[in-house]
Each structure stands twice: as C-alpha cells, then as structure tokens.
Swiss-Prot record:
A zinc finger (C2H2-type) spans 354-374, 380-402, 408-430, 436-458, 464-486, 492-514, 520-542, 548-570, 576-598, 604-626, 632-654, 660-682, 688-710. The gene is ZNF544. It comes from Homo sapiens. There is a cross-link at residues 273, 289, 534 (Glycyl lysine isopeptide (Lys-Gly) (interchain with G-Cter in SUMO2)). This is Zinc finger protein 544. SMART domains: KRAB, ZnF_C2H2. It comes from the Eukaryota.
Length: 715
C-alpha cells in the first residue's frame, strides 16, 4: 500500500469539491422544493461515484454540505440581497474557498493497478471527476430549463386567453420567477458544437451490464413533448440535427436530446413491456404508453375528452374561433400554435378517430364540444347577463362586451377588436384583399359570409322562410325585417319627431329630413339626394336608361314603381278604394286626391292669384298660365304647349293617328277626352249643370258659353 501511495504525486489528489456543484445564497433561494430535492439526489449520487473510485469521503460530510446549503437559504431569507448584483462576488469567493480546501483535503487514490503508470491513474481519476461534475451541472441545467420552458408556456397561454382558462397543475404550480442558466459553467469542448442546445447532456456512464443502453426508434418518450417536432419526423426517417454521442441516436429537438441523455445517467426502474425499453423517469413511461396503447391520461375540463399529453391538452383548451393561425395543408386543419401544427402528423395517422353519431363528422379529440351543436347544451353561463355558451372560449369573448376590453388593435387606424379573427378581417379593408371569389362570375369578397350570400343569386336559394305567409328570403335579416310587416313592430324611433320605422336604414334616411343632409351628389348636374337609390334613378334621366320593360306592350320605364303601376292598365287592378263612395283607383295618390273632393280640401294654392287646387300637378299646370311657359314644342310646326299631353295630341294632327275608337258607332278620335265626350251622346249624360237656371250640358265648354247669357259677358 505504501509503495502504491508513492506512485501518485500529491497534486494528483481529488477532493469532493472538484466534482460537486455549489450554489450561492441567491441561486439556492431561486430553486423550489422539487429542484432542491433533485440537487440532493445528484449530490448523493456524486458521492457514491467518488467512493466507487476509492476516494475517501464520509457520508456525514455530504450531509453537512447539504445542511450548509440549507443554512445559506435561511440566512438569505433573513437578510435578502439582490442576487444579480452579488452573483459575480459570490462566484469569486467560491473559487477562493475551493482553492483553499483543495490544499487541505487531499485524498489518496489507491485502486489503480500496480502495472499502470501514475500518469494513467491520474488521467482516469480526472476524467471521471470531470464527467461527474459535468453530469451534475447538466442535470440541474435540464431541471431549470424545463421549468423555464413550462413557465414561458404558462405566461403565453395566460396572455393569449386573458385569464379565461384554468391551466393544468403542471403549469399552475410553477414559481413566478425562476433561476436562469447563465450561472452554470459552459459545457466542455466535447459538446461545443451543440452550444445552441443548452439542455444537451453528454454523460458517458454505461449500464449495469457495461454496455450502452439501446434506444429503440418507436419506444422513446420525452417529458417536454410540446417542444418536439414529434415522433412523426423520426418514424418517417427525417434527418435530425441533434445526435447523442454515446448511443449514436439522432433526436429531432434539443429538449428531446436533453431527456434522452438522462436514460444513460441514472437508474432505470420503469420498464415499457411493449418494446422492452427502459425509461429513467416515470413521466417518460407514462407518456410512452399512450403511444402504444392509445390510452389518454389527461382529461379536458371543458368537454371531458382525453388527450395523451398534458401540454397538448393546454393547447386543445386554447383553441377557439379565429385563433388558429397554423394550418395543415394535408387536412386543412388549423392550429393555435406551431407545436400543435407539428403534432398534426401524429393525428393524421390515428386509426380510430372520434366520430359524431348524429352527423358522422370525425374528430381527433374534444368531440363532445361538437355534439353540443346537436344537443343545444350550453354549460358556460355569463354571471352578468345570464347568456350561455357551448364553449368556455366563447364565454371569454362575450365577457369582453361587458368589460369593454378590446386587446387586438389595428396598427394602421388604431381600431380595436375583441377577437383576433375580427382584426384580421378588418385589415383587409386597408390591404384591399378579397380572398373569397365566386366561381360563377369571378366576383371577389373580403368575407366568406358575403360570398355565401352572393352565391344564392346564382343558385336561387332562399333558405329563410316566413311561417306566416310562406315568403322566402336569401338572407336572415331580410326575414327578420319582413316579419315586422305581420307584427307591426317598428323598433326604430326618431328622437326628434317620434316617428317609428321597421328598419334602421329607414330611420337613418328619415333623420336626414331633419338635418337636411344630402350626401349623394350627381356628378353631371350637381343635384344632391338623401339616398343612394334616388341618385341612381336620377342618373337615368341623363343616360336615358329605362331598364324596366312591360312584357305585355314592351313599354319601358326608368323606375320599377312606374312599371308596376303601368301593368295595372293591362290587369285592370285598382287596389285603392274610397271608403265614402266605393270608387277604386290604381294608384294611392289618386285616392288621396279623390278624397279631397269629399272634404273640399284644396291644399295647393297659387301665390299669384290665390286659386287653390287639390292636386300639386294642377297647381303646376296653373302656374304656367302666369309664367306663359310652354316647354313642350312640336318638331314639325314649332308650336309650343304647356303640357306634354297637349303636345302628344297635337302631333296626331300631323300623323293622322286616331287611336281612341267608339265601341258603339266606330268613330275614332285623337284624344281620350274627345272619346269620353262622344260617349255622352250615346248615353245622354250631361254632367255640367248651370247653377243659375239648372240647364245641363255634355261638355264643359258648352256650359262656359251658356253662362255668358246670364252674366252678359262678351268674349
């Protein structure tokens, strides 16, 4: 033994501090209970390795080391300091203490064979020490990075959902602050090429049989599945950039490599019986089994549907209307996060998807949410107004109507919205994008709903039917407006005059009569109108367009209302009846003017002579007597007339046309008034009576001549 001791020089001795990892006060306080427990386990494991190498170190020293760390934690709680400001100072102090203790705690290495030279013994011990220390550092680094990623995921979900969801316990139990990995030593040169993968573990400990543990392709399980490109990339043979040095296996994401490396460094106690693969952590086995057996161990609080991964469930709960920016081109499925999008390959290979029993639609999870469309179940109720919803996401969006929250703001105009989908559709106004095109006429629309309504023009579909009269409509709002004609409901009331309307648009147009607003101006003559429809019909005067044609006689009209009135000449329809005398009229204004003959009302008075009339057209004609205006001129003889009807009758003197024929004697006349006077010859009717002597005449002109005999007037 003495000779063997002489082979190793004093400077080759290795102490516990060479391979153990120490924390400062600030660093220790940042660790939670689980992280501190893992630290103790790793420290004890390090002690076991040192003992196996023949280095003398009592277990009480290790325990005292851990107790000192606990004392540091209590001291920090009593007198907290800013860990960022003192981190460098503590690091330097630790290096000084470590240097002093290396001089006073030398341990003799005696297990190397006598045939081995001292330099080889020293190299083995130093290599093992470096590997143990590196394993310890990387194990703790993995723990911190895992917590950081989970905590970042929780913050992201809470930010997007606005606190509207309860996250799984895996995320909700995380501390509000976590230590960073900047305080850990850098990996050695053996893994510098993978520096971007901060969680990489390069630990070369062999299994119990002295051989490297084999990692089968389809039997891997990793604790952070959300950060992987998923097993689908590995199964399809896609090349992975991260390679584990010991086993030669390639992994498709850094966190996969991180956890995969642990299978070579700690005891493997959980066995997956399907593939004979051993897993170093129970979480790995728990998440491995659903891959083989299709079992789901995480349940959705909203729909009671189950998922195979807890973090997958978080993203399932996050999904909602308009919140799915990632889309799979193979199945046109949309996802709220890129990690879910990469999961699509696994979902697409599912052999037994969930199928709705009522409509046959298939789902990969959360089928019960869809079934609520059939059952009408709405379990999520607003506490303020009592309105219910089938999904919790819809309730979160609805509650923003009460709070006024609009978290999605347009960068161009500053307008805010309650949903991201509404912001996306709004931005099309600025970009001019119209992604929805009609395949029939190639017309494009900003919104898909507008395209659906437009396509009903081509198909003639009118899915909204009135239950009272059976009339159908292509849009739902048209049916709602139509029903008000049956109920008499007029919910839109003018605040100035109290007049009510069945449509909001009619109220808006009516209010312009009070304000005098006429926003629609003709580019040709400058005339303005309160409605766009009136401007369109006015412009037909300039263009001469008459798009409405009578199918009976071929006559055309500028306005559809004129065509409707004209068609009553052919049908003989007179829908407007006088309640006093029973006389009927084809137009409403004719009935209004007729009623004035019973009441004697003459609201239209001439400002020149004071004569009054019961119709506005009569006043207009009368005013032409004072002005002498005769705007209607004959093209053949240049004779002018005050009325267009006079010009039409005059032109028949040139053409010889006599379209009005007596049915009794066959005599024809150029004007309808002449035919009417002629009919009185056959009927004996004399409607014009003298008020002085009671004598009657067939024509008004005959009465005028007769009255001169009483007045003595000489024309």
């Amino acid at each position: 033994m003495e000779a063997r001791s002489m082979l190793v020089p004093p400077q080759a001795s290795v102490c516990f501090e060479d391979v153990a990892m120490a924390f400062t006060q600030e660093e220790w306080e940042q660790l939670d209970l689980a992280q501190r427990t893992l630290y103790r386990e790793v420290t004890l494991e390090t002690w076991e390795h040192i003992v196996s190498l023949g280095l003398f170190l009592s277990k009480s020293d290790v325990i005292s080391q851990l107790e000192q760390e606990e004392d540091l934690c209590r001291a920090e709680q009593e007198a907290p300091r800013d860990w960022k400001a003192t981190l460098e100072e503590n690091r330097l102090n630790s290096e000084k203490d470590r240097a002093r203790e290396e001089l006073s705690h030398h341990v003799e290495v005696y297990r190397s064979g006598p045939e081995e030279p001292p330099s080889l013994v020293l190299g083995k011990v130093q290599d093992q020490s470096n590997q143990l220390r590196e394993h310890q550092e990387n194990s703790l680094r993995f723990m911190v990075l895992t917590s950081e990623r989970l905590f970042a995921q929780r913050e992201h979900c809470e930010l997007e959902l606005g606190g509207g969801y309860s996250l799984p316990s895996t995320l909700s139990l995380l501390p509000t602050t976590l230590p960073t990995s900047t305080g850990f030593p850098k990996p050695n040169s053996q893994v510098k090429e993978l520096k971007q993968n901060s969680a990489f573990i390069n630990h070369e400990k062999n299994g119990a049989d002295g051989k490297h543990c084999e990692s089968h392709q389809c039997a891997r399980a990793f604790c952070q599945s959300i950060y992987l490109s998923k097993l689908g990339n590995v199964e399809t043979g896609k090349k992975n950039p991260y390679e584990y040095i010991v086993s030669g296996d390639s992994l498709n994401y850094g966190s996969s490599l991180c956890f995969h490396g642990r299978t070579f460094s700690v005891k493997k106690s959980d066995d997956c019986k399907d593939y004979g693969n051993l897993f170093s952590h129970s979480v790995s086995l728990n998440e491995q089994k659903p891959v083989h057996f299709g079992k789901s161990q995480y349940e959705c609080d909203e729909c009671r549907e189950t998922c195979s991964e807890s973090l997958c469930l978080v993203q399932t709960e996050r999904s909602g209307p308009g919140e799915t920016p990632f889309r799979c081109e193979e199945r046109c499925a949309a996802f709220p996060m890129a990690s879910s999008f990469s999961d699509c390959n696994i979902i697409q290979t599912t052999e037994k998807p969930s199928v709705c029993n009522q409509c046959g639609k298939s789902f990969s999870c959360c089928k019960l949410i869809h079934q609520r469309t059939h059952t009408g179940e709405k379990p999520f109720e607003c506490t303020q107004c009592g309105k219910s919803f089938s999904q919790s996401y819809d309730l979160v969006i609805h509650q923003r109507t009460h709070t006024g929250e609009k978290p999605y703001e347009c960068d161009l105009c500053g307008k805010s919205f309650t949903q991201r989908s509404k912001l996306i559709t709004h931005q099309r106004i600025h970009t001019g994008e119209k992604p929805y095109q009609c395949i029939e006429c190639r017309k494009s629309f900003r919104w898909n709903s507008n395209l659906i309504v437009h396509q009903r023009i081509h198909t003639g579909e009118k899915p909204y039917e009135c239950t009272h009269c059976g009339k159908s409509f292509s849009q739902s709002y048209e049916l709602v407006t139509h029903k008000r004609t049956h109920t008499g409901e007029k919910p839109f009331k003018c605040t100035q005059c109290g007049k009510s309307f069945s449509q909001k648009y009619d109220l808006v147009v009516h209010q312009r009569t009070h304000t005098g607003e006429k926003p629609y101006e003709c580019n040709l003559c400058g005339k303005s109108f309160s409605q766009s429809s009136k401007l369109i019909t006015h412009q037909r005067i300039h263009t001469g367009e008459k798009p409405y044609q009578c199918i009976e006689c071929g006559k055309s009209f500028r306005w559809n209302s004129n065509l409707v009135i004209h068609q009553r000449i052919h049908t003989g329809e007179k829908p407007y009846d006088c309640t006093h005398c029973g006389k009927s009229f084809s137009q409403s204004y004719q009935l209004v003017a007729h009623k004035r003959t019973h009441t004697g009302e003459k609201p239209y008075e001439c400002n020149e002579c004071g004569k009054a009339f019961n119709r506005s057209t009569q006043l207009i004609r009368h005013l032409q007597i004072h002005t002498g205006e005769k705007p209607y001129k004959c093209n053949q003889c240049n004779k002018a007339f005050a009325r267009s009807s006079y010009l039409v009758m005059h032109q028949r003197t040139h053409t010889g046309e006599k379209p009005f024929e007596c049915s009794q004697c066959g005599k024809a006349f150029s004007g309808s008034s002449n035919l009417l006077s002629h009919h009185r010859i056959h009927s004996g009717e004399k409607p014009y009576e003298c008020s002085d002597c009671g004598k009657s005449f067939r024509q008004q002109s005959q009465l005028v001549v007769h009255r001169r005999t009483h007045t003595g007037e000489k024309p």
